[in-house]
């Protein structure tokens, strides 16, 4: 039986990162997302600079202001977060359909079928993080292991912008020394019960019998007993049916030079064709999307009589669509190429290994 390989990707201080990307003046500043300092709301996300002052998620905004009076308080922009999240999930699904999103900024990926001797799971995780950085200009932390629990644990061990692998060689040492509050799923209430019963780290938890843990925590006790041993049989659950394939890029600076933009369209057409080939699919619609320097999003789609899957065919259609969309006087900051209305190809295509 092939050993499972699971990746857990967790974006670093996601909302704050998006705000700093879209407003470079905030970079390196203590950014607190959630609302005005005087509001009655709570903190959604705080940058690492703000966390140094003790600010954290779910804290009342008024308290955050007391701790960090010179912080940059930003109202949540969920439209931007959802749009960026969709980009990230699209990247995940370009590698595997076995993706289980847990929120806008984290997901599990089962990449068992992609792993081979010269392409370990850690390298695939590196490729994914690189794609996220190139396409969204955001960093992500990744955890790699043989089950979901350990992958999630690993993703939080070297934040921000980290990659951690937990395998059979190091799992025991990691779990035995882990503070009980750092076990995924152990909140404040559970932590207090643990402390009241002499459980302060993974070793203390490991030494409790299953019966003792069930007595303390009910049905959850069995799960805690297994976690102390690094056991988790839960599957990556994905019910999504792929409807489209695409990729997009944000330029380092706003661009209105056709030659530079069309070079990027060619590159994106190639990436999209590669992903179609991996899936052994062809497409009957092509869409080009641009975002102007004023953050206005424009798109144009063409439906086709015959399906396409090659780089050249996709580019030729994308070229026409871009020419319909462009305004020589309006620079753009992002361009994307997406194909949809997918159908099964009638010939054998490349696999992921042909283009990783």
Swiss-Prot record:
Gene Ontology annotations for the cellular component aspect, listed alphabetically: cytosol
Annotated catalysed reactions: DNA(n) + a 2'-deoxyribonucleoside 5'-triphosphate = DNA(n+1) + diphosphate
The keyword DNA-binding is assigned to this record: yes
Details of cofactor binding: Binds 2 magnesium ions per subunit.
Keywords from the named record: Cytoplasm, DNA damage, DNA repair, DNA replication, DNA-binding, DNA-directed DNA polymerase, Magnesium, Metal-binding, Mutator protein, Nucleotidyltransferase, Transferase
Cofactor(s) this protein requires: Mg(2+)
Domain UmuC as annotated: residue spans: 6-187
Site (Substrate discrimination): 15
Catalytic residues of the enzyme: 106
Subcellular location: Cytoplasm
Function: Poorly processive, error-prone DNA polymerase involved in untargeted mutagenesis. Copies undamaged DNA at stalled replication forks, which arise in vivo from mismatched or misaligned primer ends. These misaligned primers can be extended by PolIV. Exhibits no 3'-5' exonuclease (proofreading) activity. May be involved in translesional synthesis, in conjunction with the beta clamp from PolIII.
Subunit structure as annotated in this protein's UniProt entry: Monomer.
Record-stated family: Belongs to the DNA polymerase type-Y family.
Protein name per its UniProtKB record: DNA polymerase IV
Annotated organism of origin: Staphylococcus aureus (strain Mu3 / ATCC 700698)
Gene (name only): dinB
């Amino acid at each position: 039986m092939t050993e499972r390989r699971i990746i857990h990707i967790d974006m670093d201080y996601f909302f704050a990162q998006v705000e700093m990307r879209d407003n470079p003046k905030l970079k390196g500043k203590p950014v607190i997302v959630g609302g005005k300092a005087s509001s009655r709301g709570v903190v959604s996300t705080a940058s690492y600079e703000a966390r140094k002052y003790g600010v954290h998620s779910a804290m009342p905004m008024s308290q955050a202001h007391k701790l960090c009076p010179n912080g940059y308080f930003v109202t949540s922009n969920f439209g931007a977060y959802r749009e960026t999240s969709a980009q990230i999930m699209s990247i995940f699904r370009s590698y595997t359909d076995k993706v289980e999103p847990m929120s806008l900024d984290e997901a599990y990926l089962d990449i068992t079928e992609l792993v081979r001797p010269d392409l370990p799971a850690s390298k695939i995780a590196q490729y994914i993080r690189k794609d996220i950085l190139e396409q969204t200009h955001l960093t992500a932390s990744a955890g790699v292991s043989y089950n979901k629990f350990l992958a999630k644990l690993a993703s939080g061990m070297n934040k921000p912008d980290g990659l951690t692998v937990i395998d059979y060689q190091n799992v025991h040492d990691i779990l035995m020394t882990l503070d009980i509050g750092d076990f995924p799923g152990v909140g404040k209430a559970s932590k207090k019960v643990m402390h009241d019963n002499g459980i302060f780290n993974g070793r203390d938890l490991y030494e409790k019998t299953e019966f003792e843990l069930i007595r303390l925590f009910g049905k959850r006790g069995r799960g805690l007993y297994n976690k102390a041993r690094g056991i988790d049989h839960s599957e990556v659950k994905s019910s999504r049916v792929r409807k489209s394939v695409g990729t997009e890029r944000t330029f380092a600076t706003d661009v209105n030079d056709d030659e530079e933009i069309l070079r990027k369209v060619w590159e994106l057409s190639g990436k999209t064709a590669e992903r179609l080939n991996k899936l052994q699919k062809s497409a009957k619609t092509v869409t080009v999307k641009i975002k102007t320097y004023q953050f206005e999003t424009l798109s144009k789609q063409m439906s086709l009589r015959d399906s396409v899957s090659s780089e050249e065919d996709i580019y030729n259609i994308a070229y026409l669509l871009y020419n319909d969309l462009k305004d020589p006087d309006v620079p753009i900051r992002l361009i994307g190429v997406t194909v949809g209305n997918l159908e099964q190809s009638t010939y054998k295509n490349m696999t992921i290994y042909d283009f990783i």
